[in-house]
């Protein structure tokens, strides 16, 4: 007879209290740790990482719901009975393995007979666990759909999978940012006189003689097949080079920002903010990803030999993605040559969504997300099955299976962190539209407030200006425009204030972000010089000594920024 487990009526209260105290203590410590991390992100103005942390909390809450459902439904599910012939199909173990491990009675009856614990059976990880001490389905000549203990094991696996996925994404992101630190020195170099001289806009050169041309315009670039082969192997030897970074940076600035902003725009900071925003997507587990996890569980069936092909799927996908990203850079170089053999100044690449699969740069992010999850699934499944069923079990009973899973897990981690992720962070900026992260936090918040005010006034049907309704601009007036956040009003000298007051028209974007005298000034959304940022209220502007200000000028200002900064409105939202 099986030994029925004790209920809480037969358990000492001090034992229950100790267990509750330990669980509460661990839960509170985790809560405080997450709160501390969130506070640190806000202190460092890491808004995207703070959103990623919220995604992690949402995943933990989802795990809590799954745990609750598994606990509540454990008994009802274990009482669902199915015929024995159906239950005998799609097992992880072969019949020979099951007989050797559990005995012939297990195969004949289609179920595990609950027996008294045998000290000679200590190697078996299966517990003598039953919901109410016996199998109800056995009385009907059937087998339980999933036993109570099987549901408990599934519960543990789902938790391990989610934890591994989050940890895997964090490690990949951290290692990728470590690799990208060298880009800071490249960005600083663009501010030097030597760089300006080497990229003299009045200098004529052959496209093939430029550093970018010598790297990408070769004999193998004439054939698509040889170009794919070259790009495939190029990702292993300097996936992101200095010449590629500087050329793509120059092309991005020429395509999206005003002329003359190359020396002021921090492309590396923009990429960093964009990558942080993408991390909020990767760290989550979408319903589609959960469905893929269910399919992976289905492949662990005897005879499918999933250990021979499943670990290689993420490797193949990540290598194809890396080759595609290198292919995009090469195509940008070929487009330069198609326009002519001679270039003036630095080579200018032309970004476009047509370079990416299906015209969607975000599709590559989905593939990277899928690779990270698939690899995390492999390692999580290996750790869970080893914990539950010892190292050699039905899921990986061969030594080569164990070696393949571990080797592929480490290899894909290195490839994704040090090769594909930095390459993706750079090349994905070559789409038709730029990301909302082009603005720093100060400007982004100003735009949100401006949009909120404009939307509110449009809703109420009135404006703060005194112009007639028919001539009233559809955009907010100057006092509501974010232009007042892009310049300094406090620290300006008296001469600057005098010239500002004497101006016959309101200051434009090009007047706010200059540095020094005698230089061309321009609007710079990336400007980190906070001494040139000051908020002017409506009253300050209305009390200034230039009553001849044309109130329609904000419309021209808005058109100017739309012409220079082409943000995709479908991506740039103002949701709080």
Swiss-Prot record:
For bias type Basic residues, the affected ranges are 450-462
Would you say which domain of life the source belongs to? Eukaryota
* UniProt key word S-adenosyl-L-methionine: no
Main localization of the protein described in the UniProt heading:
membrane
Q: For the region Disordered, what residue ranges are annotated?
A: 450-557
GO-annotated biological processes: defense response; defense response to fungus; leaf senescence
Q: Per the record, GO CC terms?
A: plasma membrane
Positions carrying Phosphoserine are: 505
Q: Where is the composition biased (Low complexity)?
A: 467-478
Protein's cellular compartments: Membrane
Q: Which UniProt keywords apply?
A: Calmodulin-binding, Membrane, Pathogenesis-related protein, Phosphoprotein, Plant defense, Transmembrane, Transmembrane helix
Q: Where is the signal peptide, in residue numbers?
A: none
What membrane topology is annotated for this entry? Multi-pass membrane protein
Q: Which GO terms describe its molecular function?
A: calmodulin binding
Where do the segments described as Calmodulin-binding lie? Answer: 441-462
Topological domain ranges for the Cytoplasmic compartment: 35-59, 177-278, 330-362, 427-576
Q: Where is the composition biased (Polar residues)?
A: 488-503
Domain notes per entry:
The C-terminus contains a calmodulin-binding domain, which binds calmodulin in a calcium-dependent fashion.
Family in the record: Belongs to the MLO family.
Protein function: May be involved in modulation of pathogen defense and leaf cell death. Activity seems to be regulated by Ca(2+)-dependent calmodulin binding and seems not to require heterotrimeric G proteins.
**What's the name of the protein?**
MLO-like protein 12
Q: What organism does the record attribute this protein to?
A: Arabidopsis thaliana
């Amino acid at each position: 007879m099986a030994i029925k487990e004790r209920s809480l009526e037969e358990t000492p209260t001090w034992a229950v209290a100790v267990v509750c105290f330990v669980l509460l203590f661990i839960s509170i410590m985790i809560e405080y740790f997450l709160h501390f991390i969130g506070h640190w992100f806000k202190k460092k103005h890491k808004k995207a990482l703070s959103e990623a942390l919220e995604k992690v909390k949402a995943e933990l809450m989802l795990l809590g719901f799954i745990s609750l459902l598994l606990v509540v439904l454990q008994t009802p599910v274990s009482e669902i009975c199915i015929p024995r012939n159906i239950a005998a199909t799609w097992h992880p173990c072969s019949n020979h393995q099951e007989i050797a491990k559990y005995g012939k009675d297990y195969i004949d009856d289609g179920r595990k007979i609950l027996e008294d614990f045998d000290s000679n059976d200590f190697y078996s990880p299966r517990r003598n666990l039953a919901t109410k001490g016996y199998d109800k389905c056995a009385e009907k000549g059937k087998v339980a759909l999933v036993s109570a203990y099987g549901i408990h094991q599934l519960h543990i696996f789902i938790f391990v999978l989610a934890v591994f996925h989050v940890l895997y994404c964090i490690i990949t992101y951290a290692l990728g940012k470590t690799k990208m630190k060298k880009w800071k020195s490249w960005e600083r170099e663009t501010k030097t006189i030597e760089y300006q001289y080497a990229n003299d806009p009045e200098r004529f050169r052959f496209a093939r003689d430029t550093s970018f041309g010598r790297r990408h315009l070769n004999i193998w670039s004439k054939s698509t097949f040889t170009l794919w082969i070259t790009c495939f192997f190029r990702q292993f030897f300097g996936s992101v080079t200095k010449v590629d970074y500087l050329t793509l940076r120059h092309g991005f600035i020429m395509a999206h920002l005003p002329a003359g902003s190359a020396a002021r725009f921090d492309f590396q900071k923009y990429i960093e903010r964009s990558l942080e925003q993408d991390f909020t997507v990767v760290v989550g587990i979408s319903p589609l990803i959960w469905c893929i996890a269910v399919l992976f569980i289905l492949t662990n069936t005897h005879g499918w030999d999933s250990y021979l092909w499943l670990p290689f799927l993420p490797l193949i996908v990540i290598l194809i993605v890396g080759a595609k990203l290198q292919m995009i850079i090469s195509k940008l170089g070929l487009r330069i040559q198609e326009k002519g053999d001679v270039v003036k100044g630095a080579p200018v690449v032309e970004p476009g969504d047509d370079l990416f699969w299906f015209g969607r740069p975000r599709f590559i992010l989905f593939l990277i997300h899928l690779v990270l999850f698939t690899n995390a699934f492999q390692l999580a499944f290996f750790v869970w099955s080893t914990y539950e069923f010892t190292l050699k079990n039905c899921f990986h009973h061969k030594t080569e299976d164990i070696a393949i899973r571990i080797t592929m897990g480490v290899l894909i981690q290195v490839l994704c962190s040090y090769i594909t992720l930095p390459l993706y962070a750079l090349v994905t900026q070559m789409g038709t539209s730029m990301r909302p992260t082009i603005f720093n936090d100060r400007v982004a918040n100003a735009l949100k407030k401006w949009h909120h005010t404009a939307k509110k006034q449009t809703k109420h049907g009135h404006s703060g200006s005194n112009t007639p309704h028919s001539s009233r601009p559809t955009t907010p007036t100057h006092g509501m425009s974010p232009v007042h956040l892009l310049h300094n009003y406090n620290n300006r000298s008296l001469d600057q204030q005098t010239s500002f007051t004497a101006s016959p028209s309101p200051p434009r974007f090009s007047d706010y972000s200059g540095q020094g005298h005698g230089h061309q000034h321009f609007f710079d959304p990336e400007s980190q010089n906070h001494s040139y940022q000051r908020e002017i209220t409506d009253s300050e502007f209305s009390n200034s000594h230039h009553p001849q200000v044309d109130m329609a000028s904000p419309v021209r200002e808005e058109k100017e920024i739309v012409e220079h900064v082409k943000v995709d409105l479908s991506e740039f939202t103002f949701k709080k």
